Amino acid sequence: MQKRIAVIYGDGIGKEVITQALKILKAVAKKYEHTFIFEEVLAGGAAIDECGECLPMKSLQICKQSDSVLLGAVGGPKWDNEPSHNRPEKALLTLRKELGLFANIRPATLLPQLSKASPLKDEILNRGIDFIIVRELIGGVYFGEHKLEEINGEKVASDAMTYSASQIESIAKVAFNIARNRKKEIVCVDKANVLSSSRLWREVVDKVAQNYKDVHLSYMYVDNAAMQICRAPSQFDVILTENMFGDILSDEASIITGTIGVIPSASLSNGTLGMYEPIHGSAPDIAGQDKANPIGTILSAAMMLELSFGLTKESEVIQKAVQNALDKGYRTGDMMSEGMQLVGCEQMGDVILESVI
């Protein structure tokens, strides 16, 4: 198999973690006789520094022509004073929109080796944490109309949370298909007691559910969901929600699993094209110090192999290699606990690589 992968190192620790993921992917390609062609793409703060814009047209074109995109992280305080249309984060929004990446898939799974790093009590952790958040990615308040105007002598700002029925239907089908292959439970999270857009979500999701009689659907207000994720996360299997709610809840879900450093994510289109990235930020405070955790990026690469390329066996090899490294007690600083062996970003990549080759 030959696949072309656009690689966005991005900012901060992005280059460090991506370097480790590429090392693993190259080993997988050699072992299973695949050809992965990697093409570096400028985006985010690095692109601003070099080209003056967060997402050069050349970068966008390369991503469109690729089979998948692998991203490290973008952003940092260095670019905080850039105008809103040219902030590093704007590159991500543009990529999602232009590539049609409407579905964000983010697992929240407690790795047993990291249970001590979770802030939750043992009585909660013992019930297990294993759910997926399916977040609509190119609609809602992030892409609605934004206004800043002066009315009666004072500034007034507004941001529109806009959704069409077709947008909701598309993401709902993704969630139901995922749930059908898991425990067949979906909780749709909204704020239907207040928001018209949430009421439309319920109307459309109810219709989609008619084609998935084997999947149990329930609804939960977002404020309650935020509480329940910490109080009783074992109740969840698949959470379906809109863009902003999903952004907030998925970050909350990541920390209860012990560390954001190990969590991957996928942003998918209607076809096989996807963008894969760890959920952590660019962490400029530790950039260049070999302290970053590469596991989230390595697992993102594993998701890419499975979801975009259909290479399930190869994906499982990477996942097992990560488990082996943790079983042996290797930990980066963010997940360190007593009795474990502290390693840096590069060494963690090397340890995982040993189980792949």
From Swiss-Prot:
Main subcellular localisation: cytoplasm
One Pfam assignment: Iso_dh
GO biological process, one term: L-leucine biosynthetic process
Gene3D superfamilies listed in its UniProt record: Isopropylmalate Dehydrogenase (3.40.718.10)
Cofactor: how and how many bound: Binds 1 Mg(2+) or Mn(2+) ion per subunit.
Amino-acid positions noted as binding Mg(2+) in the UniProt annotation, renumbered to this chain: D223, D247, D251
Known partners and oligomeric status: Homodimer.
Protein name: 3-isopropylmalate dehydrogenase
Organism of this sequence: Helicobacter hepaticus (strain ATCC 51449 / 3B1)
Organismal lineage: Bacteria, Pseudomonadati, Campylobacterota, Epsilonproteobacteria, Campylobacterales
Gene giving rise to this polypeptide: leuB
